[in-house]
């Protein structure tokens, strides 16, 4: 303390006091935080030390800087920057801020969080009170009391920290969370700055948490679309879909304003939160989240039970229950050998969660009690009384007020209401009591009590005895709560089996439906409602899913489902005006059962839905009959034919439940394709009934499209049926009432409960009709402007994508709509950058973004002026598009860093999200890129050559065998796989087709080499493409191998890894009717033979010889009609003959093969003659037994010494020189070869030809006869003149290589040398 002057106190809280101070002997003003040690536990002191350690290493302009820290005897003192105030002061003084100021604060908050998250630090308590105002208008983030630096082995956390107003949904549900919880809090803060209140605020903690979990955010009209889109991304309830790093940095609301602090490399902290996790770490994170997540459906208890509990809780607030509880604790006993029930008391944060989770199911009851909308937040008391009770700071006595240590299951009266109430409270499905239900399940007395209560009270109920109902209802509620809250599926299923569930429940349901006397009882409705709640909770249990199966649970589940269908069928077969409540509850339970079936295996779900067309068809018939009776509340437009007008006074809950059940049967949930097999059969059945001329079903469903409640469900039913029936599409496309209803839905003229989803389904429905009919239904051409308006003006990404899908279909049918480039680019950018909420599978198994991508391609093609393409290529849309594609493919941020040495095992990559972009969408996106780069080729080069290029990472991934296997197995993947591969190859050809800087080209080649693209191209051709489409990939492979030695090795190693398959492919490709393909392959093989050692060339020998070693492939290639093919074949032979003794033997033993080789010497094409002379020359080198057979070639080669092509003359001269050593001197003399070679050596204009002739003469002079001829011709004198001419060249001119050989030959021809 001797370093500082303490000036004045500026703040106080439960942590201690904050003083303004000044460092002695300087003008530096600081803040001193005094934290008392007295009364602090060791854990609190450790947490304090952790905060200090975290703050000590932080250096960022938007994070408060800790200057110093020290301890006194009684306190810990932390010295930090002095700030001018809190952000909270602005809110209290001004209410809210202009959007430009909010934008500046947003950029600074994002900057601070980016810094923290890049260091793997979570703040976990983001709120206005922890944001300080610095000089100059900046902000600084402070208070790291809850911060947590995570180790590399920790991916998610479960401990709950933070302030309720700014807690994310996963926090209040106590699900595992990560850095995205901080981003949710930022969204809450920015919303509050702009609007004046937090996005979720209520006077009760119950209401608050309910709003956070369930309610959408209310958006005032004053917020700009860009800001709203930014907040929508941050305030997305699903953390997996929440706007996060790195996409957050590119959002237009803050792009370019975020400060990124780069630091020198420190210790390896693991993957920062600001980078996408590599696949292996993502798998680890998912496993941790799954292991730590609460299992099962929490909070699935009847609303009425919660309402009663809430009312009791409100009454108890005004009572002093301490003594009563204390007395109860004294009298309670625990039976020997039984596990005590868990304590109901909780820590302050646990209490808030308990209340919050209860509130998530109490939303409707609070609304009914007249609470209404959340009032504006009073600034003077932001936490509210309920929050204070939930988060007491200095009131430890509160913790034990609801504590009940144990419940004695033996000593209490069996029918005690208190006992069942305790059990109901104990089994409340809240996170802090996850162990309590498990304790009950492991208690044999509890299981026996439940079973006996159900048997005894059930028997009394069936006799109509009121006492039975009073005893069984509490047991029902405990069971419902227990089934909804327990996370241990093994223990829960074991308990159900021991307790006789669900058999007892379904038996009670069956007998109650058959008992007329029971149905007359006044309490019958309540009894059935609670019974159905338990059955519904049972069907929703996770042990009914195949991935969580326990012993024979799946068999029991299927049997229970079949029994329930029998009971439902009998109920639906009764008169429609009977048992309305029972009918409604059964239908709701059936809907839950369908949801459980959808998440199960293909076999189980198919058996279930198929039974609705066979043994359980009475259920489906009853549902369809319910839609055609007069109770259906259809809304018929004026002038339309009257169909089944409703009885207005009747309740609409039955038609709503029926339509919801039908939708559950027909609609395949996104991401669960296995259930479609069974649902498709049901849709076929319904479609056949809908297309019958005499059926009243179609008019009923069409009329219901304008009903507020039924509309969405019936849209889904009709849409699903049209997916399988083209005839139904034709009928609806010709039905005026159906089309009018759909048009009105698009135009917003029908009031429906969920306008966004209803409009989305309608847009896809109309797209499906156009797609299936391939023409426009009457009147749809007028819809273009309305759909275009939805596309450009909607801020809901799913609506923009659905509108784009329909616009693309309309455009293909010639409908024009006015879309300005800047408008559609902005709309596309918004849709691609906003979180995707996929609620329905688009037509044709398309992805969420497919329609948008197809529309963009269409617009670019139609409006494809160079200026437009330049605008698009430089727009934000282009960047967002690449990032979205990368996310769909689930690429890590640094894809290139994961590439290693050649690995043909190709470990599988994460499955792409086909629900977002399907194979068709990928093909459209790549075509869009091709259209852009064709006009702007330099853009392609810059995108591919920049370090860490997203485009390059995408293209490389699209060629990986693991991805191609996934693509082939995806719906319609086989159809679009060639398009994807060929588009990728075209894009990768750009660097080779354009004049590219050499250094940049080297970088591109290195990137492709490190990613094993050469190996992948060969595998693509062998396993995925038809022969007619391999020309381009082989051409690219050849170019890579000719340019880069490592790529050539990858090609050879890939052949060695699968020789039989690849040699078979190469054999077929060589003999194809595609000359360019054959030429490229021969060029690739020739380069391989020239560069690599003989040990790597056996596959080429096998390729040419064939399995029967007849060399039929080689014969066909030597006789090919195309000059280029013959030339490349001779060139390949020339390189092989340098190493292959087997090929030399084949030329000698295989009839006619040598003749084909020599035939090339007389070919009309000079390139072929050149290659043939090269091959014959190498055959003549150390020919051995082959030498005599080559004598027939001497006349032809002698004639070629006068060929106008210098290359041919050079090759022939070398070949003749080789033959002189094989005993063919007589033949050479007969053809006057020595004379011809001497003439070439002295007079050929090409230096390399002269050199070849001199080398040949040096070899031939060893033959006495040839030497004598040379001497007689005066070779020494002629060569001396040649040598003299070389010496007279200027000193600056380099001496030709032939000069050395000339001198050597003169020396050899001297008479003394001949001695």
Swiss-Prot record:
- One GO MF term, please? protein serine kinase activity
Annotated region (Disordered) at 312-345, 365-405
> Domain of life here?
Eukaryota
Protein kinase domain location is: 4-254
- Which cofactor does the UniProt annotation name? Mg(2+)
* Annotated transmembrane regions: none
Q: What is its EC number?
A: 2.7.11.1
Q: What Gene Ontology cellular-component terms does the record carry?
A: cell projection; cytoplasm; cytoskeleton; nucleus
Localization (cell): Cytoplasm; Nucleus; Cytoplasm, Cytoskeleton, Cilium axoneme
Question: Which residues are listed for ATP binding in this entry?
Answer: 10-18, 33
Q: What Pfam families does its record include?
A: HEAT_2 (PF13646), Pkinase (PF00069)
UniProt feature, compositional bias: Basic and acidic residues: 379-397
Q: How does it assemble?
A: Interacts with SPAG16 and KIF27.
- What is the name of the protein in this document? Serine/threonine-protein kinase 36
- What is the organism of origin for this protein? Pongo abelii (Sumatran orangutan)
């Amino acid at each position: 303390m001797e370093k500082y002057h303490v000036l004045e106190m500026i703040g106080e809280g439960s942590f201690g006091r904050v003083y303004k101070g000044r460092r002695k002997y300087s003008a530096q003003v600081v803040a001193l935080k005094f934290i008392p040690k007295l009364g602090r536990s060791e854990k609190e002191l450790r947490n304090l030390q952790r905060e200090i350690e975290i703050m000590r290493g932080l250096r960022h302009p938007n994070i408060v800087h800790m200057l110093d820290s020290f301890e006194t005897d009684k306190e810990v003192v932390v010295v930090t920057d002095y700030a001018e105030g809190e952000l909270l002061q602005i809110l209290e003084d001004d209410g809210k801020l202009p959007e430009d100021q909010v934008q500046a604060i947003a950029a600074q908050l994002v900057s601070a969080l980016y810094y923290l998250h890049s260091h793997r630090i979570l703040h976990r308590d983001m709120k206005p009170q922890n944001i300080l105002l610095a000089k100059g208008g900046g902000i600084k983030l402070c208070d790291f009391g809850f911060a947590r630096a995570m180790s590399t082995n920790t991916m998610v956390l479960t401990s709950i920290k933070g302030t309720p107003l700014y807690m994310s949904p996963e926090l209040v549900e106590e699900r595992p969370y990560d850095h995205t919880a901080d981003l949710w809090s930022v969204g809450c803060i920015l919303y509050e700055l702009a609007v004046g209140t937090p996005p979720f605020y209520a006077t009760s903690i119950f209401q608050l948490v309910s709003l956070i979990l369930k309610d959408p955010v209310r958006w005032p009209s004053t917020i700009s679309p860009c800001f709203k889109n930014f907040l929508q991304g941050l305030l997305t309830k699903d953390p997996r879909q929440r706007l996060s790093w790195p996409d957050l940095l590119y959002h237009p609301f803050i792009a370019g304003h975020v400060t990124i602090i780069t630091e020198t490399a420190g210790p390896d902290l693991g993957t920062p939160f600001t980078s996408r996790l590599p696949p292996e770490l993502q798998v680890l994170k998912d496993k941790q989240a799954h292991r730590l997540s609460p299992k099962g459906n929490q909070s699935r208890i009847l609303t009425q039970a919660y309402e009663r509990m809430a009312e009791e809780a409100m009454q108890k607030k005004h009572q002093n229950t301490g003594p009563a509880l204390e007395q109860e604790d004294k009298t309670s006993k625990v039976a020997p050998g039984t596990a005590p029930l868990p304590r109901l008391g909780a820590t302050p944060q646990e209490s808030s969660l308990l209340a919050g989770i209860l509130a998530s199911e109490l939303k409707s009851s609070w609304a009914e009690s007249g609470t209404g909308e959340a009032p504006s937040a009073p600034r003077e008391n932001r936490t509210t009384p309920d929050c204070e009770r939930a988060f007491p700071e200095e009131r430890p006595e509160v913790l034990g007020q609801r504590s009940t240590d144990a419940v004695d299951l033996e000593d209490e009266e069996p029918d005690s209401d208190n006992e069942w109430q305790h059990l109901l409270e104990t089994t409340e499905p809240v996170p802090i009591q996850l162990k309590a239900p498990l304790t009950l399940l492991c208690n044999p007395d509890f299981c026996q009590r439940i079973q006996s209560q159900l048997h005894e009270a059930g028997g009394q109920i069936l006799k109509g005895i009121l006492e039975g109902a009073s005893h069984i209802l509490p047991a029902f509620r405990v069971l419902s709560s227990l089934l909804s809250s327990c996370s241990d599926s093994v223990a829960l299923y074991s308990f159900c089996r021991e307790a006789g569930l669900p058999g007892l429940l379904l038996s009670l349901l069956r007998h109650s439906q058959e008992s007329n006397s029971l149905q007359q009882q006044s309490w019958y409705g309540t009894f059935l409602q609670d019974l159905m709640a338990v059955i519904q909770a049972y069907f929703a249990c996770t042990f009914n899913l195949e991935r969580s199966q326990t012993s024979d649970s799946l068999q029991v589940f299927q049997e229970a489902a079949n029994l329930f269908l029998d009971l439902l069928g009998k109920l639906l077969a009764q008169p429609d005006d009977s048992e309305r409540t029972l009918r409604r509850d059964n239908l709701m339970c059936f809907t839950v059962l369908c949801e459980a079936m959808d998440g199960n295996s293909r076999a189980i779900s198919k058996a279930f839905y198929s039974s609705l067309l066979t043994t359980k068809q009475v259920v489906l018939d009853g549902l369809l009959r319910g839609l055609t009776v007069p109770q259906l509340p259809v809304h018929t437009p004026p002038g339309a034919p009257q169909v089944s007008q409703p009885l207005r006074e009747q309740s609409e809950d039955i038609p709503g439940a029926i339509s919801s059940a039908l939708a559950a049967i027909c609609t395949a949930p996104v991401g669960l394709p296995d259930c479609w097999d069974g649902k498709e059969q049901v849709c076929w059945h319904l479609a056949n009934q809908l297309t019958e001329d005499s059926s009243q079903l179609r008019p009923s469903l069409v009329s219901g499209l304008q009903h507020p409640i039924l509309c969405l469900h019936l849209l889904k039913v009709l849409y699903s049926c049209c997916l399988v029936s083209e005839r139904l599409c034709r009928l609806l496309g010709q039905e005026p009432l159906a089309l009018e209803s759909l048009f009105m839905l698009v135009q917003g003229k029908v009031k429906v409960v969920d306008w966004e989803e209803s409009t989305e389904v309608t847009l896809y429905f109309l797209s499906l009709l156009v797609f299936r009919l391939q023409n426009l239904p009457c009147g749809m051409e007028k819809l273009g402007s309305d759909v275009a308006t939805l596309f450009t003006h909607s801020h809901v990404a799913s609506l923009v994508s659905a509108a784009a899908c329909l616009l693309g279909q309309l455009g293909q049918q010639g409908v024009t709509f006015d879309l300005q480039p800047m408008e559609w680019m902005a709309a596309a950018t918004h849709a691609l950058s906003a979180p995707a909420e996929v609620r329905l599978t688009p037509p044709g198994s398309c992805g969420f973004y497919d329609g948008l991508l197809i529309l963009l391609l269409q617009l670019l093609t139609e409006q494809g002026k160079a200026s437009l393409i330049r605008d698009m290529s430089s727009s934000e849309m282009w960047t967002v598009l690449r990032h979205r594609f990368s996310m769909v493919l689930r690429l890590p941020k640094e894809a290139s860093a994961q590439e290693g040495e050649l690995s043909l095992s190709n470990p599988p990559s994460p499955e792409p999200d086909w629900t977002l972009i399907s194979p068709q969408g990928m093909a459209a996106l790549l075509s869009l890129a091709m259209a852009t780069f064709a006009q702007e080729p330099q853009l392609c080069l810059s995108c591919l050559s920049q370090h860490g290029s997203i485009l390059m990472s995408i293209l490389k991934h699209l060629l990986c065998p693991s991805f191609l296997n996934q693509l082939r197995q995806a719906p319609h993947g086989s159809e679009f796989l060639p398009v994807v591969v060929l588009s990728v190859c075209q894009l990768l050809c750009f660097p080779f087709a354009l004049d590219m800087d050499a250094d940049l080209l080297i970088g591109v080649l290195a990137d492709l080499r490190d990613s094993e693209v050469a190996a992948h191209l060969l595998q693509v051709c062998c396993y995925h493409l038809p022969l007619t489409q391999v020309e381009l990939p082989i051409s690219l492979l050849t170019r890579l191998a000719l340019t880069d030695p490592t790529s050539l090795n990858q090609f050879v190693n890939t052949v060695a890894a699968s020789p039989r398959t690849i040699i078979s492919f190469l054999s077929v490709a060589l003999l194809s009717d595609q000359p360019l393909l054959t030429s490229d392959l021969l060029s690739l093989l020739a380069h391989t033979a020239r560069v690599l050692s003989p040990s790597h060339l056996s596959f080429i020998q096998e390729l040419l010889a064939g399995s029967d070693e007849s060399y039929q492939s080689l014969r066909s290639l030597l006789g090919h009609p195309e000059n280029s093919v013959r030339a490349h074949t001779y060139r390949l032979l020339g390189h092989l003959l340098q190493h292959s003794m087997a090929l030399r033997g084949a030329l000698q033993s295989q009839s006619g093969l040598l003749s084909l080789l020599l035939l090339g010497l007389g070919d009309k094409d000079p390139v072929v003659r050149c290659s043939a002379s090269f091959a014959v020359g190498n055959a003549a080198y150390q020919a051995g037994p082959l030498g005599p057979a080559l004598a027939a070639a001497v006349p032809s080669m002698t004639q070629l010494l006068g060929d106008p092509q210098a290359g041919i003359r050079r090759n022939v001269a070398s070949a003749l020189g080789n033959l002189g050593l094989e005993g063919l001197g007589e033949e050479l003399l007969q053809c006057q070869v020595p004379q011809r070679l001497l003439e070439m050596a002295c007079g050929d204009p090409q230096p390399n030809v002269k050199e070849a002739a001199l080398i040949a003469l040096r070899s031939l002079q060893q033959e006495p006869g040839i030497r004598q001829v040379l001497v007689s011709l005066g070779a020494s004198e002629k060569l001396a003149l040649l040598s003299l001419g070389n010496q007279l060249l200027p000193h600056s001119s380099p001496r030709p290589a032939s000069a050395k050989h000339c001198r050597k030959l003169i020396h050899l021809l001297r008479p003394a040398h001949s001695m």
